């Protein structure tokens, strides 16, 4: 049975000066013989890790079709001797590395899916330290790092007080569906949740408001020869998309790096069956992202009313489907999340192992990954990264191979600190 550590006790620890600075991490932890051995083993396997990383990248895993990767990860969990290994009905794979007892239970989650459809050329190209290929970073690099972290703990003979759960999730890229399903149905209620799903230059402890919609316009249709002046769903889609991008947005929030928030994005559109007819139906999707609920609610109202108005103007039918929305009404208050020892520990370990010459990492009250679901359930959560990755969600995506080893070491330090304090 998984141990639940009272939140009040965790927050009391967070109030101490030592915890406020480094959370539960102290560099002396790395000098323990078993931890040192685990860290050294990562150095010894550096080239093999990169080769396996490349093989994982070249294994297709579009959202909803992660079965090949799931099979591989499950087999590796079995080799590790994890307990309670499960592949659920949507192909999330999880396993538990049992602790000695008395410590918190912590989930380390990396998602298996990528945004790239079947048929994408996934061949990885090497250019010195640079690895180029779709999915090389998001999130295959972190999946590889998490797997290797669990292996290294075993190689070092590291014992943790609490249980460590390895969750390889699915469908993160299409609404965090895998993490939601696992947290709602697995029967586990972890004390803390760590998503390994960003670049190693970041630590996120919050959750963006993310809402996704699919808008449909419909009509009876008509042959091209009868189309002049007739209501057209295609025309409505074109006008609606243009109108949505004309909606005034608040100033870009500062302090979030490349994030330009709030934002409206049309990511998909389609409709029709032949070239020589008005389509009976045409559709497009909208992804809204904001830092706060008030801004998001105003954007949602503006987007929905604009899309509906265009339908009325064009004389076509209109309907919408909400594809994603997360209720954060139960989330812990911002200050409690920021000052939780989990966040401070993640900051300390990430900064300890960060690339020399790079800026100090600061925690951001944001998030667009599996940790969002944990945040919404009042589970202390954070998102970290293991690798320096660049241009995610693009065919030109690339990552720095040499960043993998220190990234894995950072995860080892984080896992031991969180479960053995």
Each predicted region: which residue ranges?
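Acidic-enriched catalytic cores of C-N bond-cleaving enzymes acting on peptides and small amides
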Residues: 22-26, 30, 227-269, 277, ...
């Amino acid at each position: 049975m998984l141990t639940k550590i009272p939140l009040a006790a965790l927050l009391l620890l967070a109030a101490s000066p030592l915890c406020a600075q480094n959370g539960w991490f102290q560099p002396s932890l790395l000098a323990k013989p078993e931890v040192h051995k685990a860290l050294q083993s990562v150095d010894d396997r550096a080239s093999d890790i990169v080769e396996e990383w490349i093989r994982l990248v070249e294994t297709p895993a579009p959202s909803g079709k992660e079965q090949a990767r799931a099979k591989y990860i499950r087999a590796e969990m079995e080799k590790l001797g994890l307990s309670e290994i499960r592949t659920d009905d949507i192909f999330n794979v999880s396993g538990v590395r049992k602790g000695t007892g008395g410590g918190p239970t912590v989930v380390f989650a990396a998602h298996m899916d990528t945004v790239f459809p079947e048929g994408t050329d996934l061949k990885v190209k090497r250019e010195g330290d640079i690895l180029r290929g779709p999915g090389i970073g998001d999130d295959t690099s972190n999946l590889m790092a998490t797997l290797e972290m669990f292996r290294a703990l075993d190689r070092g003979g590291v014992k943790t007080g609490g249980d460590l759960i390895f969750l390889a999730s699915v469908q993160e890229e299409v609404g965090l569906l895998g993490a939601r399903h696992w947290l709602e149905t697995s029967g586990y209620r972890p004390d803390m949740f760590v998503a390994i799903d960003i670049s190693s230059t970041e630590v996120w402890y919050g959750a963006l408001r993310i809402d996704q919609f699919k808008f449909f316009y419909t009509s009876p249709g008509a042959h091209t020869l009868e189309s002049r002046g007739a209501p057209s769903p295609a025309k409505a889609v074109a006008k609606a998309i243009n109108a949505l991008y004309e909606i005034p947005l608040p100033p870009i929030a500062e302090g979030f790096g490349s994030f330009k928030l709030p934002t409206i994005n049309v990511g998909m559109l389609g409709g029709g069956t032949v070239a020589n007819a008005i389509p009976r139906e045409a559709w497009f999707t909208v992804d809204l992202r904001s830092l706060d609920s008030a801004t998001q609610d105003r954007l949602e109202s503006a987007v929905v009313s604009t899309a509906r108005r265009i339908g009325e103007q064009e004389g076509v039918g209109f309907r919408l489907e909400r594809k994603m929305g997360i209720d954060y009404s139960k989330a812990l208050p911002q200050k409690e999340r920021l000052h939780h020892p989990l966040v401070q520990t993640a900051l300390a370990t990430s900064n300890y192992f960060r690339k020399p010459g790079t800026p100090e990492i600061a925690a951001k009250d944001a998030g667009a990954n599996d940790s969002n679901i944990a945040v919404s359930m009042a589970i202390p959560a954070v998102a970290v990264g293991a690798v320096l990755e660049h241009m995610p969600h693009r065919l030109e995506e690339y990552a720095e191979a040499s960043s993998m080893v220190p990234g894995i070491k950072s995860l080892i330090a984080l896992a031991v600190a969180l479960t053995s304090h």
